[in-house]
Amino acid sequence: MTKTKEKAPAENVEARLEIFYKDKVVPKLMERFQYKNVMMVPKLQKIAINIGVGEAAAEPKLLETAMSELAQITGQKPQIRKSRKAISNFKLRENQPIGCRVTLRRKTMYEFLDRFVSLAVPRIRDFRGLNDTSFDGRGNYTTGIREQIIFPEIDIDKVPRISGMDISFVTSAATDEEAYVLLAELGMPFKKKNN
């Protein structure tokens, strides 16, 4: 009998952007902010993607379509989000499905960020950079995308309706400046600041 080396499972392989973070971004952030320990360096903790489908009350098929598109984009099954209270002006009842969301962590988070920065964002029409004022004061960044068709996983011919999504990048950074530098080093194309 010959012994063969077993290949490592795919889960143990690090994402390209995660390796880049450890090798290049961490030393730059340590130098820039004078951290004394590697554990003090901010890192990306999770990415939350949300699609709100307000018209799901009238057409439940729209929510199913949004869920399948979000699953294609992220590679993960979305959660259905339900309304918290009834609002008669919007013809909305309590606990009615109105959207879906996915939370990405670890390897899938870095893979999504890599695809988002290098493939999806350059496909945005009239793109001049992401707005850098959407930080929340605690080191988290949220941006809105108007069209889901910027992602290469979505087949434009099979999209019944153009819908947008909200993408939140949650970091361990204490300040917005640290989060801005972290995301910029990871390749996030922010608008150029006028000095």
Swiss-Prot record:
What Pfam families does this protein's entry cite?
A: Ribosomal_L5, Ribosomal_L5_C
Return the GO cellular component terms, semicolon-separated: ribonucleoprotein complex; ribosome
InterPro entries this protein is in?
Ribosomal_uL5, Ribosomal_uL5_bac-type, Ribosomal_uL5_C, Ribosomal_uL5_dom_sf, Ribosomal_uL5_N
User: Record keywords: Aminoacyl-tRNA synthetase included?
Assistant: no
Q: Which Gene3D superfamilies does this entry report, sorted A to Z? A: 3.30.1440.10
Example GO biological process: translation
Please give the superkingdom of this protein's source.
Answer: Bacteria
A molecular-function term among this protein's GO annotations: tRNA binding
Note whether rRNA-binding occurs among the keywords. Answer: yes
User: Which keywords label this protein?
Assistant: Ribonucleoprotein, Ribosomal protein, RNA-binding, rRNA-binding, tRNA-binding
General function of this protein: This is one of the proteins that bind and probably mediate the attachment of the 5S RNA into the large ribosomal subunit, where it forms part of the central protuberance. In the 70S ribosome it contacts protein S13 of the 30S subunit (bridge B1b), connecting the 2 subunits; this bridge is implicated in subunit movement. Contacts the P site tRNA; the 5S rRNA and some of its associated proteins might help stabilize positioning of ribosome-bound tRNAs.
Q: Which PANTHER family does the record match to this protein?
A: 60S RIBOSOMAL PROTEIN L11-RELATED (PTHR11994)
- Summarize subunit and interaction data from the UniProt record for this chain: Part of the 50S ribosomal subunit; part of the 5S rRNA/L5/L18/L25 subcomplex. Contacts the 5S rRNA and the P site tRNA. Forms a bridge to the 30S subunit in the 70S ribosome.
Family statement: Belongs to the universal ribosomal protein uL5 family.
- Name of the protein: Large ribosomal subunit protein uL5
Q: Which species is this record about? A: Chlorobium limicola (strain DSM 245 / NBRC 103803 / 6330)
- What is this protein's gene name? rplE
